[in-house]
């Protein structure tokens, strides 16, 4: 497994920046049980890492899969070097398409928070930013952070999303395991 890194803005009831307010998001998404959103969706949890695309060395740290930039990076040092600093943020370690259950994998100073399902462009979360796929999963299938905690369930939802919505671009997803740093950004 390849561990990758990113930093994302926090999104919870204290969110006061431009964009959709937390209250409006909860009403729209119907995810009333969320306490915060720890997502890889760049529209909801903004990407805080800004690589210098003109610098050839930066491309050594930018993770691409196929033709897509993932907004994941190969080292935490690069994330800190190119990060837009905020008082509160999510420093994340991720694994794209893990082949084993990750909840018992221990990473120093990180806690496993669940599995995200991002579309093939690595932009939009099928779990929290598509208005719901009620034929495939229910809001109660998600944790209070908007992720799926169970490995088998994540891959089952991935499979059924595409079966039930073959024409929907955001239903063709990548399963991504997510760990969050327990002190940095908290």
Model-derived features: positions:
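Short, mixed-charge low-complexity intrinsically disordered segments
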Residues: 41-100, 143-147, 155-186
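Short aromatic-glycine-(Arg/Gly/Cys) micro-motifs in beta-strand/loop hairpins
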Residues: 1-29, 37-40, 49, 55-62, ...
């Amino acid at each position: 497994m390849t561990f990758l890194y990113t930093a994302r803005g926090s999104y919870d009831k204290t969110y006061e920046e431009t964009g959709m307010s937390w209250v409006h998001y909860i009403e729209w998404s119907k995810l009333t049980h969320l306490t915060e959103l720890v997502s890889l969706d760049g529209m909801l949890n903004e990407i805080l890492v800004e690589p210098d695309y003109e610098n050839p060395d930066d491309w050594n740290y930018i993770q691409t899969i196929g033709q897509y930039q993932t907004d994941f990076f190969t080292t935490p040092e690069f994330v800190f070097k190119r990060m837009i600093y905020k008082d509160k943020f999510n420093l994340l370690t991720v694994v794209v398409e893990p082949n084993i259950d990750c909840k018992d994998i221990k990473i120093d100073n990180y806690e496993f928070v669940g599995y995200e399902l991002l579309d093939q462009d690595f932009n939009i979360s099928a779990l929290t930013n598509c208005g719901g796929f009620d034929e495939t999963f229910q809001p109660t299938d998600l944790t209070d952070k908007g992720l799926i905690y169970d490995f088998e369930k994540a891959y089952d939802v991935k499979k059924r999303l595409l079966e039930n919505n073959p024409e929907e671009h955001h239903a063709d997803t990548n399963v991504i395991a997510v760990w969050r740093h327990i002190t940095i950004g908290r």
